[in-house]
């Protein structure tokens, strides 16, 4: 029997299935991106205001070169150990903020903040280039699952890792070029990936320019540039099946642009040294850390201290006294501390030789430091573990013709680790390598194929959460730094009461700009000699002592202490400055007699050639 139902009018009723709500997360990732960048910049600006004093001998050398740039003393700027671009940035900041010696650190912290903004731009350029190459290399007929992280998610991740690095090894208080180097290396790598994605020669040229600027920041980029050019040619030929002449032409264009930017400085340095020279820092550090060559005050007759290096010194330190070693630095007319202003001057003609017996233990120690760095940056690895738990899979197809977009940046990042593991590894050296390996690895993550599309939303949400937590943690740290300043009643984060107090006390004694002084001990002479720059004086004589021996003990154990003091006095320095353990300089014994405490700090000064009355003209900065 067939039942017929009467239609009562209107359209017939249709069965409707529930439709999924539109995916709003990508929309909010795009909308929140400018706000997140603003928050990241804001908390980093807080670091620039409140980060504590972290000045060392390297920082003073960069500041001194910046002074020479402002004075247009081009001969003094050419330096085989420190490159000029970061000092030029410091000089620009000094000029913009109209700084004096006593407040210049504020300007330099602001320069570091500007470099952080450049790093953010470089991160965006790098991640966007990664995604562009990834999408263009993906075969539309590929049966592989889609990629897990989109362009904006990778941006958040990159800035998040940068912000964490700024909390640690690349902090605002470190007046060093590593952050600027990282920015230019990232821009160079981004240009390389853009060229691989588009075949446009302008990106090869931009790569050469960015790497040239990286070289002017730090000579490490000289070797890295050639690795990038080789990677460009090999990837174009082997993976993209381009003709060899076209790939080589792009590499030559990058090399020409690099030479245009870096060539004049290399030519000037080579002329100064009398040989082709792009920088001596790598060679000297290899000699010091691997070959076992003596680092400080090496003399031509100290053959037992040459280690495995070949040594033919052209202008070693002038030794005034052998026991203890008293050294004069009058040969070099530049720098607050000429000994560290240009280490390549005093150690010219040291040629390091590779020795596997010496290399192996050094490399093992460097690998341990790399593992320690990875352990000290667990956030990214924990994120990777969470993404694997929600279904992410890492499929790295490296075969020619495959979508191996990740291969070039990961190999170049690994190259950074390999280069530094041959000599010496510090966290700030390998931060770029960490980014160059990690971000492409995250970009290569795909869905497992068995997980719904919602897994991508979960992955993006986890990355966003980590990025916001990094901003929140930075805000907490900045707030704590600000509270500490109020408790200590310090005028600024960059202010160190001992260092600034010692400099003002020296000025009050009549020691000021244009004067020379002597020092004793590694703390006063090398590690914390910013007091001399603040006071406006140059350290031209040093009583050298081993780092492990306290200064007071070294003075007490000198059988010829009076002869040593007379030798130092004969060099014309106004005072002898040392950094002493608090409480030992009582003034009641022959060792401490005559020494003057400098403004309740651990710094003390022994008058040598002071005028009868302090000069008021030199008492102010």
Residue ranges and their predicted role:
Residues 82, 167-180, 220:
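Short acidic/glycine- and proline-prone juxtamembrane loop motifs at membrane-interface regions
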Residues 148-149, 188-204, 214, 236-240, ...:
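Membrane-interface transmembrane helices that cradle and orient dolichyl/undecaprenyl
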Residues 51-65, 76-93, 99-106, 273-280, ...:
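Extracytoplasmic catalytic/substrate-binding loops of multi-pass membrane glycan-assembly enzymes
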Residues 30-38, 152-156, 206-209, 225-237, ...:
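Signature aromatic-anchored transmembrane alpha helix within multi-pass, membrane-resident enzymes
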Residues 70, 272, 276, 458, ...:
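Membrane-embedded, lumen/periplasm-facing catalytic core of multi-pass transferases
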Residues 74, 91, 102, 293-398, ...:
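Lumenal/periplasmic acceptor-binding loop at the mouth of the active site in multi-pass
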Residues 107-146, 187:
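Transmembrane-helix motifs of polytopic, lipid-linked glycan transferases
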Residues 303-319, 495-546, 574-582:
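Short periplasmic/luminal acceptor-recognition loop of GT-C membrane glycosyltransferases, typified by
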